[in-house]
Regions:
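Active-site diphosphate/adenylate-binding microenvironment
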Residues: 14-17, 22-26, 32, 40-45, ...
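Thiamine diphosphate
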Residues: 38-110, 116, 270-271, 275-295
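Short internal beta-strands
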Residues: 31-33, 105-106, 172, 245-252, ...
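Glycine-rich phosphate/diphosphate-binding loop of Rossmann-like nucleotide-binding domains
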Residues: 221, 229-245
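Glycine-rich beta-alpha junction loops
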Residues: 36, 109-110, 173-179, 226-228, ...
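Glycine-rich phosphate/diphosphate-binding loops that line cofactor/substrate pockets in enzymes
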Residues: 14-27, 66-71, 160-165, 206-221, ...
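Conformationally flexible catalytic loops at phosphate/diphosphate-handling active centers
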Residues: 8, 128, 156, 160-216
Length: 410
């Protein structure tokens, strides 16, 4: 066997990268062309993956953010180096603050120019250090210095973006690595890796303790956040609310996880919440927080006299979230559970039906909620039907709501 025959067949990384994304089910990539990512764009020309080209990188980042929110899967953003990456920063940071999964693939200067300060290199504190810009808000930032490591780094990037508390990650790739050739077997081995991690749930004993406390409570309230949407636990939440007859307040990110016209939905809390809603959460004896971070605006800057008064001698908190750091961050927690919301609510629903086969009695607060909605509707009729120009925001949203089916986003 000759030396030439013994060498494994190799292929361009850019071509293999695109095939990898196809295999993962990626259908769209958002970004803008630049000389550091042109090799990937060339490989995309014959691919089923559609490249959404925009006029500014911030647009691509916001588009990728919105796409991930709708699909529930990590979106892909392809960025040019330095100014391209900094232009995208606001959109990526916004996704990070809202826990939206995103894989940012950024081109960078050629690796053989490290230390020479080539065109558009970020190098004030270290050579080729543009990835450092993203460190404060991505879950992890990789700089790919070895071509052969890109396949496993990219696999880790997708898993990390979508697991636990989701969020963006950055894979920083020198432009010469996109055009390098490596053994396709390095990519093939990633196909054997699981594409979804098993998420933690809640044990029956803890579930029974939670149901017992909520059943014995005189004024329990649910407070739900965006974690319910990220877990796609809409049906499980509705079943739990209907069976337990507990009113539901929500954060800004939790709006829509239970239909606004559900008879037990109180509405948003905090600065943008109504007085009626804040009064219910303030006077609750037990609060079940689901997938929420108890952020400042949703909690009236945590002043105990406005929205939540949680602590000794006041409301008691049960908090379920996928991220351990969120438990007890802003309020003392009686029962804290690290779990995926969909899995946890399935267990809670099962245990609730075992303990309360017929459910709790209809909550008398339903009538007060209906009265409050009628009052607000009457109060807003004039603005929602106004013929004023420029158009009133209330009129715009009323018309959009009327024109769209209930389950559509205007």
């Amino acid at each position: 066997m000759t030396q030439e025959q013994s060498q494994p067949a190799k292929d361009l990384i850019s071509d293999q990268l695109v095939r990898y994304l196809e295999d993962r089910g990626v259908e769209h990539i958002f970004g803008l062309c630049g000389h550091t990512n042109i090799a990937v764009l060339s490989s995309l020309a014959e691919s089923s993956v559609r490249f959404i080209n925009v006029r500014h990188e911030q647009i691509s980042a916001h588009a990728a953010d919105g796409y991930a929110r709708v699909t529930g899967k990590a979106s892909v953003l392809l960025s040019h180096l330095s100014p391209g990456l900094t232009n995208a920063a606001t959109g990526v940071a916004n996704a990070a603050m809202d826990c939206i999964p995103m894989v940012v693939i950024a081109g960078d200067i050629p690796s053989y120019y490290y230390g020479k300060h080539p065109h558009q290199e970020v190098n004030l504190h270290a050579d080729a250090s543009q990835y450092e810009i993203y460190r404060p808000f991505v879950k992890r930032a990789w700089r790919v210095d070895t071509a052969e490591l890109l396949p496993e780094i990219l696999e880790k990037a997708f898993l990390l973006a979508e697991s636990g508390q989701p969020g963006p990650v950055l894979v920083n790739v020198p432009m010469d690595i996109f055009s390098a050739e490596i053994d396709p077997a390095l990519w093939d081995r990633q196909k054997a890796n699981t594409k979804e991690l098993t998420k933690p749930s809640i044990d029956d004993e803890t579930a029974r303790e939670i149901i017992t406390n909520l059943t014995n409570a005189s004024a329990p309230v649910l407070y739900v956040g965006g974690g319910v949407a990220l877990a796609k636990a809409y049906d499980e939440l509705r079943d739990f609310v209907d069976h337990m007859q507990i009113p539901v307040s929500h954060s800004l990110m939790g709006k829509g996880v239970l239909a606004d016209d559900h008879p037990l939905v109180l509405g948003m809390t905090g600065f943008w919440g109504m007085k009626f809603t804040n009064e219910q959460t303030l006077n609750a004896d037990w609060i079940l927080g689901l997938g929420t971070r108890f952020k400042e605006a949703d909690c009236s800057s945590w002043y105990p006299q406005y929205t939540f008064n949680i602590g000794e001698g006041a409301s008691k908190l049960i908090h379920i979230d996928i991220e351990p750091q969120e438990i007890g961050r802003n309020y003392p927690t009686e029962i804290g559970v690290i779990a995926d919301l969909k899995s946890a609510l399935k267990v809670l629903n099962r245990v609730a039906r075992e303990m309360l086969p017929d459910g709790r009695k209809p909550n008398p607060l339903i009538e007060k909620i209906a009265d409050e909605r009628s009052r607000l509707a009457a109060q807003n009729v004039e603005m929602q039907t106004s013929e004023a120009f420029p158009m009133m925001p209330d009129r715009i949203f009323a018309d959009l709501t009327a024109a769209n089916p209930p389950d559509e986003t205007p």
